Amino acid sequence: DVVLCVLPLFHIYALNATLGMVARNAATIVLTQRFEPIAALAAIDKHRVTNVAGAPPMYVAWSAQEGLGEALAGVRLLVSGAAALPRNVMEQFETLAGQPIWEGYGMTECSPVITASLVSGTPKPGFVGQPLPGIELELRDEDGDPVEDGDPGEIFVRGANVFSGYWPEGSQGPDEEGWFAPGDVAYVDEDGDLRLVDRRRELI
């Protein structure tokens, strides 16, 4: 595989989820200093890119380019993260490019990926998929109890991917049972896919 990464390497999405996975799988990465829509498409063609790790503004910009389907003909996987991808952008992009964008949800404190539509196997506008293997996810109400199926609740995550706490004293990390609350509110649909609906609090 050849992966295009125009994301800043100081961000964990680029460093862990992109560069780290490239190294782990002995793939090739194509780096650019900054994102410029036409230049990025040219790099995809020049280096025969097969996978793209991106963020919503990239796909918004590309949606305005002519011949998008031809430019991305050799790409097998388009991934979006770091922010919510607007539903209309996802639908428009799929119409123009002829292939879907796969979304994920995560944060630095969780190394970073928590859920991904690649796990569920179906890209669904507005949803961020299911937990990665080895990651537990619960939705809880204000009393800390699990919510009823289909009801929104605060996200709690547990797994080896979760950090131990903030430097230097390790504060605000997981509880004694290993559960960490990112501060987001979501619900799970009948397929088991997660949809973010609110933000309960800021971590910092």
Question: Whereabouts are the PLM-identified features?
Answer:
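Active-site glycine-centered loops adjacent to acidic/histidine catalytic or metal-binding residues
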Residues: 82, 106, 129, 184, ...
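Conserved ATP-binding/catalytic segment of the ANL
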Residues: 145-150, 154-204
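Short, P/G- and charge-enriched loop/turn segments at secondary-structure junctions
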Residues: 121-127, 173-175
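Gly/Ser/Thr-rich phosphate-binding loop
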Residues: 24, 46-54, 63-123, 136
